[in-house]
Amino acid sequence: MSISPQEVKKLRDATGAGFGDCKKALSVAGGDFELAKKKLKEMGIVSADKRSGRDAKEGRVFSYVNTERVGLLLIACETDFVAMNSDFVAFGNSLIKQLVESGRDILDEHQELEIKNLAATIKENIYVSKVYISNIASNELVKNYLHGDHSKIGVFVKFKIDDALKMQDEKLNNFAMDLALHVAAFSPLYLSVNDICLNYIKEQEEIFMRQMESSGKPENVVKGIISGKLKKHLGEIALLEQGFVKDDKLTVKEKIEEVSKLILSKIEVVEFKYLSVG
């Protein structure tokens, strides 16, 4: 039977086993997820490598962008020393380039084997923790950024530009890079308040209500305070509502509008991604 890459990835995430081993186990199990997990244990795959049981709390973020796609990759390891290892860094840079150029966010069998070989050479538990690949349209501008020598934080920000002739504008590109730095510094969870799920908003509102239960203030005053607290909190986790890193008198949304007027073209942030070690 045909085994989809998504099924293989799900089993990989659950067991930590390699791509080829997961695919084989799923094939033998006829696609049954739980049976495939059992088959991996029977094959000795899940527990065979003693290093696989050790915590991998360190790591490094890698990024690559071309004209068609941008990607972020987080490879986990056990120590900061290995995260700075030249072989580890070279492997990560090569892997994210391969993934971006192929448009895949799932490793193939050869790439899985390369990770196993690197782990055996370095003698640490090493694995791909997160991969994110995003396509770039012809009217979109992307800026990526890795923070510090250890690259423990990696981000990209994607902009839609109405006038494609403005893509090379210096003011636009400087602002785009500044916003990538902003995302690295403030780690927003959402693009806008509208992207925040209603359940989260309701839960947060209930938290603020419990905090005000013993305040002794009139109900209308309490409602106003809760409304203010909620607005402030949501603004802190939504990128467009955050105070811009280089001028906190303006929100990011207001800064975008300002730059749009400067370059005489509407610009819009359509996507961002933030990855960090730990």
From Swiss-Prot:
State whether keyword Cytoplasm applies. yes
**GO CC annotation terms, alphabetical:** cytoplasm
- Lineage top rank: taxon: Bacteria
Name the UniProt key words of this record, in alphabetical order: Cytoplasm, Elongation factor, Protein biosynthesis
Protein's UniProt keywords contain Protein biosynthesis: yes
Write one Gene Ontology MF term. translation elongation factor activity
Q: Where is this region: Involved in Mg(2+) ion dislocation from EF-Tu?
A: 79-82
Instruction: List locations, semicolon-separated.
Output: Cytoplasm
The main place the protein resides is cytoplasm
The protein's job, in short, is: Associates with the EF-Tu.GDP complex and induces the exchange of GDP to GTP. It remains bound to the aminoacyl-tRNA.EF-Tu.GTP complex up to the GTP hydrolysis stage on the ribosome.
The record's similarity note reads: Belongs to the EF-Ts family.
Q: What is this protein called?
A: Elongation factor Ts
Identify the species of origin.
Answer: Borrelia recurrentis (strain A1)
Kindly list the organism's lineage: Bacteria, Pseudomonadati, Spirochaetota, Spirochaetia, Spirochaetales
